[in-house]
Amino acid sequence: MTTSIIYVTVGDQKEADLIASKIVEERLVSSVNIVDSVRSYYWWSSAVQQKEEFLLIAKTRTAVVDAAIERIRDIHSYKCPCIVSWPIEKGNKDYLEWIGRETEGTGIR
């Protein structure tokens, strides 16, 4: 079993809480950390934009990443949201196994 991190930015606390609660409740991820007051700079509409955002860091099995990303995309309010993932190479074995157990309910192998 391999595990991954999903990194997501959102515009406000309400949306962060909504996405986090939905994807945990639906067992697409084992847990989500929410970090507030992340300052983002990006190019949009032919200009540099700056916005205070919230960061979600979700943990899941790699096999579930595509389904989790799709679900986050369905809920997310942005036209082009930042939703990216990368594998966890190493970590606390007990924690990584817990991630696997908590996301088995998805039926995705």
Question: Locations of the language-model features?
Answer:
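Positively charged, small/polar-rich N-terminal and surface patches that mediate targeting and assembly
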Residues: 1-109
